[in-house]
Curated annotation (Swiss-Prot):
It is an enzyme of class 2 (transferase). InterPro entries: P-loop_NTPase (IPR027417), PhnN (IPR012699). Signal peptide: none annotated. The lineage of its organism: Bacteria, Pseudomonadati, Pseudomonadota, Alphaproteobacteria, Hyphomicrobiales. It comes from the Bacteria. It catalyses: alpha-D-ribose 1,5-bisphosphate + ATP = 5-phospho-alpha-D-ribose 1-diphosphate + ADP. Keywords: ATP-binding, Nucleotide-binding, Transferase. It comes from Chelativorans sp. (strain BNC1). Catalyzes the phosphorylation of ribose 1,5-bisphosphate to 5-phospho-D-ribosyl alpha-1-diphosphate (PRPP). Belongs to the ribose 1,5-bisphosphokinase family. ATP binds at residues 27-34. Pathway: Metabolic intermediate biosynthesis; 5-phospho-alpha-D-ribose 1-diphosphate biosynthesis; 5-phospho-alpha-D-ribose 1-diphosphate from D-ribose 5-phosphate (route II): step 3/3. This is Ribose 1,5-bisphosphate phosphokinase PhnN. The keyword Phosphoprotein does not apply.
Amino acid sequence: MFSASIERAQNEAPFPIRQGVFVAVAGPSGGGKDSVMAYARERLGNLAGEIVFARRIITRPFAPGGEEHDTRDVPTFEREEAAGAFALSWRANGLCYALPAALDEEMRSGGVVVANVSRAIIPALGERYAHIFPVIVTAPRGVLAERLSRRGRETRDEVLSRLARSEAGELDVPGALVIDNSGPLEQAGERFLEALRKAAAWSDVCDMV
């Protein structure tokens, strides 16, 4: 009776949401997270209806060929943040980032949500969602430096700062699946696609508990 009461109280609490699986994709700038995610997204097959790729809100203008995201200026971002419009928000590299609060309903429906996030917010994700599957997409320093220089979005000092963060062990996440994306995209993409299949299977089990 006592354990049943605890379980009922847990299920009635708003957070952490105990349905669904959140696939938290992190890694150093230049690691190719967006490319790996796009590769898998195009090949979901019959899992397409179960997996949602979150669209981030960022205080950065949209650039052709870059990540598709919703843009806000800083004052608007901060107003929406204060109003509870975001499931989670964070600051990094001089920008503000957020995930929309609508993802809570996707999780409660028992689906799989995939999002590009900062490693630093993964503990906070665990407070909001009970089932987190962290994935780190990375590459050696030389590959990161080449990619960052090629995309031309950061200054030299910003590139060096991002490389220093990856070397400082900032991307170490206990229990994470680490994907090396220094070779052909297909190799990393297939590993990530397999991770999504496992996340979908895990979500099915979560829904039965």
